[in-house]
Swiss-Prot record:
This is tRNA N6-adenosine threonylcarbamoyltransferase. Keywords: Acyltransferase, Cytoplasm, Iron, Metal-binding, Transferase, tRNA processing. It catalyses: L-threonylcarbamoyladenylate + adenosine(37) in tRNA = N(6)-L-threonylcarbamoyladenosine(37) in tRNA + AMP + H(+). Substrate binds at L132, L133, S134, G135, G136, D165, G178, N274. Belongs to the KAE1 / TsaD family. It comes from Borrelia garinii subsp. bavariensis (strain ATCC BAA-2496 / DSM 23469 / PBi) (Borreliella bavariensis). It comes from the Bacteria. Required for the formation of a threonylcarbamoyl group on adenosine at position 37 (t(6)A37) in tRNAs that read codons beginning with adenine. Is involved in the transfer of the threonylcarbamoyl moiety of threonylcarbamoyl-AMP (TC-AMP) to the N6 group of A37, together with TsaE and TsaB. TsaD likely plays a direct catalytic role in this reaction. GO terms for molecular function: iron ion binding; N(6)-L-threonylcarbamoyladenine synthase activity. One of its GO terms (cellular component) is cytoplasm. Fe cation binds at H110, H114, D298. Its cofactor is Fe(2+).
């Protein structure tokens, strides 16, 4: 079965063709560079650019896959969570294709798709612990199947990727913040500033994260946390911030691994491409899986791959399915399917 996967939840216009949930025939992505001068994604600009680009991206994906549109068996599309305007462009495009081609459509949860992505490159037996790190989400999950996901912990304020973006914006390091800070930090001393690392002691927040304190310390209280007589350079700020940002993840992650007795870890999301993070995670000395770099960030392949499995198990989505920008009752919603 050939699945067309459409992902437009934020600023990347992504369309892929995947066969039988795992064989990637094409995986086309168009980055919207127009947001760089704003140091963040402007929703109105994102949706307009999706509208302008989505047809050409689809044509490129089909051509790369050597597949005619009539040979597509299923259309999978992100319907939540994300920017409303961007989601609408992708969903309406998918609905138009489904109706005109008389093909089934399956609406996909963006978070579940990120958690599925590592399975497209590695054979991983359930259960395992997943760590999702992206511009919009930071969470730890226990996975028993592609559709049986229990959120153990999440960020209580900024996501990890969002904190990187805000620090990078303040110090003019470029957008997106993650890859720019990673590059700039290579020539810095990570011990110049000793930024705070947040861990929670209450049971209800045992696996949760917080990045607001670290962000405030780095942007507004920089000199207060200086621990070495090194110059206050962008390189040293970037290196010290990156170190603290990833140390913020380690304690909740250790707790989740210990409490669940699950010794397999899957890392997903755009921040998972950070090589410094991978060094930190590898020190945990447990079996760890990373998706290839093109499956870390937003992509259509993960939508198509998960869509294939969801369709086989649950069938097609109602054509009237709408978009949703958020997940209400966040921690509990992901156990909705049994």
């Amino acid at each position: 079965m050939k699945v067309l996967g459409i992902e437009t939840s934020c600023d990347d216009c992504c369309i892929a063709v995947v066969e039988n949930g795992i064989h990637i025939l094409s995986n086309i992505k168009l980055n919207q560079k127009e947001h760089k001068k704003y140091y963040g994604v402007v929703p109105e600009i994102a949706s307009r650019l999706h509208t302008e680009a989505i047809m050409s991206v689809c044509i490129k994906a089909l051509k790369k896959a050597n597949t005619k549109i009539s040979e597509i068996d299923l259309i999978a599309v992100t319907s939540r969570p994300g920017l409303i305007g961007s989601l609408i462009v992708g969903l309406n495009f998918a609905k138009g294709l489904a109706i005109s081609l008389k093909k089934p459509i399956i609406c996909i949860d963006h978070i579940l798709a990120h958690l599925y992505a590592p399975l497209m490159s590695s054979k991983i037996e359930y259960p395992f612990i997943s760590l999702l790190l992206s511009g919009g989400h930071t969470l730890i999950a226990k996975q028993k199947n592609f559709d049986d996901v229990e959120i153990l912990g999440k960020t209580l304020d900024d996501s990890c990727g969002e904190a990187f973006d805000k620090v990078a914006k303040h110090y003019n390091m470029g957008f997106p913040g993650g890859p720019n800070i990673e590059q700039i930090s290579k020539n810095g001393d990570e011990n110049t500033f000793k930024f705070p690392v947040t861990t929670f002691r209450k049971k209800e927040n045992w696996y949760d994260f917080s990045y607001s304190g670290l962000k405030t310390a780095c942007i507004h209280q920089l000199e207060k946390f200086k621990s070495k007589d090194n110059p206050t350079t962008k390189n040293n700020i970037a290196a010290s911030f990156q170190k603290a940002a990833f140390e913020n993840l380690i304690t909740p992650l250790r707790r989740a691994i210990k409490d669940t007795q699950i010794n397999k870890l899957v890392i997903a999301g755009g921040v998972a491409s950070n090589l410094y993070l991978r060094e930190k995670i590898n020190k945990l000395k447990i079996q760890t899986y990373y998706p290839p770099l093109d499956l870390c960030t937003d992509n259509g392949a993960m939508i198509a791959g998960l869509g294939f499995n969801m369709y086989l198990k649950y069938g097609e989505s109602p054509i009237e399915t709408d978009v949703n920008s958020r997940i209400e009752n966040y921690k509990n919603q992901y156990r909705r399917r049994k």
